[in-house]
Amino acid sequence: MPSSSSARSSQSLRSSAAAAVSTSSGAADQPSVPIEILVEHLLAAKRSLSSMTLVLEANDLTTQARSVHEDSVVLAARTAFLRAGIAQQIHTLERIRRGLARTYDVGRRDFEQLIKVLDDAGERLTRTMNVLHNTIVDPVFRPAGEEPRSLMFFVDEGNVDRLTKSLKESIAELKAAETSYDGDLLRFDNDIRSVKKHLLAAPGLPSPSNSVFSRPMADLVRTLTNHSHAMAENLSSLTRHFDLCVTAVRASEGGAALALRKAAEDGPSTISISGVIRGDGTDADDQDIKTMSARERDEMLRVVMQDATEVGEVVRDINSGLEEMQALGALVEQQAAHVRTAHECTLDAFRRLEEVEARLGSYVAAEREYVDRCEVEKDAIHERLAQAEDLVVFYEGYAGAYDGLVLEYERRRNVEDKIRALWRKAAAAVEKLEEQDAAARDSMRKDVGDYIPGDLWVGMDDPVRKWKVVAVDEGEGGSGEIEGSSVRLKKGTVEAARERVHGR
């Protein structure tokens, strides 16, 4: 809006110009004005018209600001649309990332559960192998003179080593797959953070609810337009004042010649008065001047003199108005630059998003590879677990069989001891019968020996038939009769075997 002084000057000049063409009969008579004063006012009015360049510049500023505003509105709309799209894509990427993370978490839980199962199986296998290592074979079951050996000596321990090595390799593969996939997830996270960072780095866009600047650009453009209109009106008033000065000078005797001479002395100017001062006597102004009454001329001179006092103020208003418009134009350009910067930063975020989306396929492929590798290695580990379970069952059966062997040996030895005891009792009974038989024979011999001839006594003096019980080895490679009893097991061997059997 124009300043109050500018408005007053413009209004005063317009009112004076209107009064100059009025022929009101109530106007007071005014004294004549020296021609020199009129010429000075004419030259001052001519110089004031140089403000036309300022008005044109103001118009250019307004036109440019309006164009910049229109471009900024379009660019801001595009930027807002692009930002909304990027934000939606980021949301989609985060959903995909959460899905990939769930796959990783499931694989991680499966891996931890698998490790627990492996630990349990390994602990059971180790416990069983320790039993075999700690169980020394009793010498009764081995050749004489052989050094003591544990049960583990008689089985292939390499199976366990190979199984353990295979399990370690599978676990290492699972760990490598997990590490590789974790690296892919980390890179995906970095990509998403990079897009967010680029988007957040973009300056905010002005909006009615969130004004980045103190004055919206549209308000600045409206103010520039109002200023431009006010300056144009001031220039129009200066132009009418100039025309009125020309008329007053031409209406004064000798005024035209003096004006031309003074204009020449005033130096070169973009505005020439020669064309409007000379006239050719045929135009309407010349006719008006010729028919102008003294009263009308005096009224015209009064208006010229009154307006002349306000020319300087109007020119200053035009200059100050242009300065204010230049400042406003700078603010418009500043906001436009802000919008352009926001758009460029948003484009950077969009380009970064395109790069991330180009790599999205590799992240999804990494998930598939991770799942496949885990399945392969888990199948291999479950197979090894089955083998480990078979080894545990075999080793436990082996240890149990040895304990059964010890108990069986002890049972057989006990049976032999019982048989031996029975045979001892039988031998004692036989010996007693033999003693009784010997006594009976002596008694009979004494009773009938003197009466029976020797021919009838044939064989009666033979000793009673003897019986002998011996142990016989009927096994493979046996040598027939053996003496003595079975070898006893080492002290504590049987008790230890019984404890292990009862503990299973």
Swiss-Prot record:
This protein's record includes keyword Lipoprotein: no
A GO MF term: protein kinase activator activity
Pfam families the UniProt entry points to: ATG17_like
A GO CC term assigned to this protein in UniProt: Atg1/ULK1 kinase complex
Protein's membrane topology: Peripheral membrane protein
Listed InterPro entries: Atg17, ATG17-like_dom
Disulfide bonds: none
Keywords, alphabetical: Autophagy, Cytoplasm, Membrane
One example of a Gene Ontology biological process annotation: piecemeal microautophagy of the nucleus
Compartments in which it is found: Cytoplasm; Preautophagosomal structure membrane
Membrane is among the record's keywords: yes
Similarity section: Belongs to the ATG17 family.
Protein name: Autophagy-related protein 17
